[in-house]
């Protein structure tokens, strides 16, 4: 799958560049991230990247994005009385379809494919690298959200990312660290808030993200 990512991106953005009305921009913001596993809490993280917005006719549009996004979770009292915090950095590619509603609102939904670039966990300030055995490199999910377009250049987006892939596997151990033979799996759950800035706006001053 990794070898397919580059040509897919090339094709998508090449198609967009052929359209006179296609717009390009950058975006960045905050993530409230968690993994749906027992005793997990959300962590505050970030995301940043670029997008291309292509009108398809009427009020319908297609928007591919390429983001660096940090996700993860915090497990309460995981190691005796200490919390365990996971931080995972992904290269994410949302491919959303949407519709303009009125002059300022855009609703969108679509798949998101992510590849894990780095990750680690922290117990009471002590950091460690993630053991590859317990993590999935790839994540696939569904994104849905809404954008409020303040001006032709600036917009605010609220989006929820619902992961389908078990990205983390936690083993159950006793107080001596002995494997008890069980494990728990979890999927990414992320609420995103971002600000978007359009760099180029083609030939049409349309409402865009």
Predicted regions: what they are:
Residues 74-75, 139-209:
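Predominantly the C-terminal beta-signal and adjacent terminal strand-loop region
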Residues 37-40, 70-89, 117-138, 167-186, ...:
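Flexible, solvent-exposed loop segments that connect beta-strands
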Residues 22, 42-46, 87-91, 136-142, ...:
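Residues that define the transmembrane beta-barrel architecture of outer-membrane proteins
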Residues 40-79:
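Glycine- and aromatic-enriched membrane insertion/assembly motifs of diderm outer-membrane
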Residues 22, 59-62, 104-107, 152-158, ...:
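Repeated loop/turn-to-beta-strand initiation elements of outer-membrane beta-barrel proteins
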Residues 1-27, 195, 199, 209:
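Bacterial Sec-dependent N-terminal signal peptides
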Residues 31-35, 69-73, 114-118, 161-167, ...:
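Structural signature of outer-membrane beta-barrel domains
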Residues 26-30, 48-56, 66-68, 91-99, ...:
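Residues on the lipid-exposed face of transmembrane beta-strands in outer-membrane beta-barrel proteins
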